[in-house]
Amino acid sequence: MPNNVTLHIPNLIKQIQADFPDITFEAGSHFSWHAKTRHVSYLPDADDPRSLWALLHELGHALLNHTDFSSDIELLNIEVAAWAEAHRLAEKYGITIDQNYIEDNLDSYRDWLHVRATCPTCYERSLQIDRQTYRCH
């Protein structure tokens, strides 16, 4: 496959569809993986390197069979795994993913997790009890 300069979303989609025919790709308003319907949504007009990286990241979720998560830390682990898979795919397709972009993306999850795990009363870290509830310890 060509490098980032000449590789465009439509070309990458065609190649990915040939390589992974069990996954459907649908134009949408954002990049996302839909486990129930086994399809990846993508921005059809996006044509920058970050869009290529996002597409590979969502494909990573698909190939790793990510469906759901039961805790916030599990979500973070799923995101890390999807980016690792995107890295592997990028090599296959001759794409270089900026590691700083990946870390910035993961930092947004880490920051979100930190806020959710901080008790609003005492500002100490708390423990997640279920998907929606944290308990101060």
Predicted feature residues:
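Alpha-helical scaffolds flanking conserved acidic
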Residues: 49-54, 100
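Histidine-centered divalent metal-coordination motifs
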Residues: 57, 61
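Substrate-binding clefts and substrate-entry loops adjacent to catalytic sites
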Residues: 65-74
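Metalloprotease/metallohydrolase-associated module, dominated by Zn2+-dependent proteases
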Residues: 73-137
